[in-house]
Amino acid sequence: MKKHIASILFLFLLSTFQLIAQSHSVKRLGIEQGLSNNYVVSITQDKQGFLWFATEEGLNKFDGTRFTTYYKNDLAQNNQGITGNELNRVYADTKRPIIWIATQRDGLNAYNYNEQTFTAYQHNPENPHSLITNDVTDISPSTQHDDGLWISTYYRGIEYLDITSGQFTHYNKSTVPGLPCDQTWTVLDGGDGNLYIGHVGSGFSIFSPKDKSVKNFRNEAGNPMSLPGNDVFCIIKDANGNIWLGTNNGLALYDAANENFIMFKNNKNDKYATLCSRILSIRQLKDNRLWIASELNGIAILNLKQSMFLSPEEISLEYIQEGADSRSLSNASARCIFQDSFDNIWIGTWGGGINFISSKPPLFTTLSYSPIPNNENSLNNKVASSLCMDRQGRVWIGTDGGGINVFEGEKRIAIYKKESGNIPSNFILASLQDSKGNLWFGSYQGGISYYDNRNKKFRSISLMGQSNLDVRTIYEDTQHNIWVGYSGGIVILNPLTMEIIRHYNTENSELQSDFIRSITQDEKGRFWIGTFGDGLGIYTPDLQKIKTFTQRDGFCSNTVNQIIQDKQKRMWIGTGEGLVCFLSTDELNYKTYQRKDGLINTNICAIAEDKKGNIWFSNNKGISCYVTSKDCFYNYSHSDDVPAGSFSSSCVTQNKNGWIYFGSINGVCCFNPDITMNEQPAPAAVITEMKILGRLSNLENNDMIINLSKGQNVELSHAQNSFGLTFNVQNYSLVNQVEYVYMLKGLENSWYTVNENNSVTFRNIPPGKYEFLIKARVHNQEWPEEATSLTIRVNPPLWLTWWAKLIYIWVSISIIYLILHAYKKKLDLESLYTLEKKNHEQEQELNQERLRFYTLNSATLL
């Protein structure tokens, strides 16, 4: 009875899989980005945050920007490398700095990323405790012992590795007679004392290592409660303790209470037959959804958050299929699924490399062109030249040659073209939804088209008997009349009768130009009219000139692309050479914003105001926002997923939820301003590599990589005083949105911005102790207070060490002493010589006196 109740509760939790109306933005990484091979079979993440990918040729480490590859017999590795290139599985040890690698024919490898060394575990016929065979298919950590791993092999059953001793215990038909087969695809330690084993052609077994008991389940023809297929490729245990299996014949759920299986192969909503194909990987994500990877049928997603009962035949699914657009997989065969520590999803495909799905919604998404005619998620033309939103929330996109594309959400539901008789021209340059919900379209060489929202029909309107007019703007005034600006002036239409009320041009009015680009009426009833080549004009309702603004008067540009009035009654004018704001419509004083004020580009194409009063505008370098509360600009470019290339003039619309749409030469860029401007905590910068640069004169590359895994202190010799540092953030979803500043404290105590490549280079740094500091922030956010640091000590050469300097001082003192001693001795000798000389002179003088005395006495006596 308890088993029956448990089964009912289990099914209750399983029920009501909901279809999630969410599209996934998929980024692709492959051999072009440095991946060793596009056949990716397993993914894991180490304790330092780096991702590891096992492929059909080599092991790959990914730091967020660059791949480091590991091959068999790699000459770049100074120690023993990986034993094989053809891999099956990678697993990051949660207790140790080790990546475990299962190879197809070359045993088990353990890579210590702190020591950067490989340890190989291979079959040794002379050692009974070695790995029994080298064909390793899967790795599962032991839940009973921290020092244990369970290994499945293709030919010789299950192995248990005692990591401390390095010895293997063998579980196969020789040691466990109840095992149906030694060929295994996968093994899972369920944490309940049982191992769950997926066999090659022999179904699914539950094995108790303690008592060596085995239960085996296989497909039984005609039994819908049996295992759907006898090849079991993957097994997982979800958060509720349920066992899910991926087989060669679909997905199965093990009902432990009744010892049978729930199959999903008869699900009527499985339009791609994913759940009855070969299931190669199953992963439960943190949001309680199951992601199921299949061969040739992409990915199916089941939501486990349930509230009512549905049978397996009725559950709904979400799919990610192969396709050419950014919402599809690069290959229909998905081999593995992994969720990283930032909740991002990584998918390994068979031939399509890596597919990445961010946990965060993209700042900007693009409705882009696809050459595939029946692709409902894309435009039929590259250039979006006009935009408007109808009352049902559908976006009407006028294109430059493809007519009108209508989108509901991200799905194209209609195309209206000249060839189908709906519109007179496929080149749509202007559009408007009027106050009654009807749509107006202006075209190049096609005049005006009117779409009646009630009867869902188009009507062409001839202006002055001409149908080939170049219409650039359409506006509805406060009297609900329709103003049409074209290359011959302005036409005002009565929308009820479709008759022309008035036609204005430079000949019959005070208009300064016939080339009209934008029309807006302010709160005083005046009309602000922007032209191509003759600046801005302000007019009365009957187009009497009030004031004009041109370059001759100091206005920044004569080309006006769009004019809007915001909630504060300010007028914003997008020109070819700056953004102009009239703070008041009374005094007509204005301020011009240009590059010196923070604009990334001054060719302002289209303008919109969000719900918070911020002013958004497209330009030729991306999209910018004037943040009213901060009086500053936020700039977004291609690195933020804004389409590359120029944007279209006056091509903008908004939906009722506040989403803004800008048209460009590469599709429609849409975004939620609240999400785009949401404050994000600064990600921590990670120093990923330090490279000692070889001498520039050498033809060979003598650069040397320094291992930074052991700590944040590096000691270099005097000959290693030229080096480069590479850094990144480990959340790949932020990689293109992050900017960096750095400082080498001790050399220069100033912060410098990093321009590109996430790296800096220092050359000929003098001996000393330095601290390298690096900060990261998301574009337009604040810099953090804390920085990632690396202490670098450049040791002096032998002749500049402290003891060498001490010897130099001692020798110098000795030399000085000897010089002084010699000098003193010289002085003493000179003094003695002078004294002797003086004495000698005195003696000579005395002798001379004596001689004179004797001579004088002698003469006297004579």
Language-model segments: residues:
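Sec-dependent N-terminal signal peptides
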Residues: 5-15
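Residue-level "micro-hotspots" composed of small/polar
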Residues: 8-10, 20-45, 51, 71-88, ...
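Residue-level detector of Asp-centered blade-edge/turn motifs that repeat once per structural unit
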Residues: 45-48, 92-96, 141-146, 189-192, ...
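Conserved beta-propeller blade signature
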Residues: 50-52, 98-100, 148-150, 194-196, ...
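Loop/turn residues immediately N-terminal
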Residues: 57-60, 105-108, 155-158, 201-204, ...
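Short loop/turn segments that connect beta-strands within beta-propeller blades
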Residues: 63-66, 112-116, 162-166, 208-212, ...
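Cytosolic signal-transmission helices at domain junctions
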Residues: 818-853
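Helical H-box environment at the start of the DHp/HisKA dimerization domain of histidine kinases
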Residues: 854-862
